[in-house]
Amino acid sequence: MPIGSYSSFRDIIRQVLMHNPKTVLDLGIGHGINGAGIRNWLNVGIKENYKQTTLIGVEGFRQYHSPLWDCYDLVEITTIQDYLDNSNAQYDCILMTDVLEHFDKDEGNAIINKIVNTKLAPGGILLVSTPAVWIEQGAAYGNELETHRSLWHFTDFIGMPGVEIIKDGREDDMGYMMLVVKITKV
């Protein structure tokens, strides 16, 4: 879906604010709510402050375009895999919110490893959120990229260097069961 979990949004934005990144890559932006949150809270909603943070979005489905995309300095219309293969940039913060479940486990782990090893700047953070329960979903809105292919558990991340489990998948105060993980490049 072109939207993520409301209950994870507050955790993601909190981590972004605590890290205060100068460069942010948002992978799988959907309608662009993460960009709006970053501009609203990190840049205090003031257009002149936008230059303090470079915000790049990647989205594989052009039809998700919304006015929130204007919060980004640039939105690349391509798959996450192609972007990671063809970009040499490094970022202080990379977001994968409600994206990981769209890859099988092997591909998801390969993407995480590529991000941490080649796309995160030293001391940078990767923030991942994904449902902690299986939700059957096919090609929503005619978008094959929306198909759910995997279920992740916090134990899938244990042992990775720099991992901090922010939300472990247990039901939260809103009734959601989400996993939120921060990986810091050491």
Q: How should each PLM-predicted stretch be described?
A:
Residues E136-A140:
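A short acidic, helix-capping loop that chelates divalent metal ions and anchors anionic groups
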Residues W134, K185-V186:
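Residues that cap or initiate secondary-structure elements
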Residues M1-A89, C93, D106-N113, T118, ...:
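Conserved N-terminal segment of class I S-adenosyl-L-methionine
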Residues G123-P131:
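Conserved beta-strand signature within the Rossmann-like core of class I S-adenosyl-L-methionine
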Residues D98-H102:
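Short catalytic micro-motifs in class I SAM-dependent methyltransferases
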Residues F61-R62, P131-W134:
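Short beta-alpha junction loops
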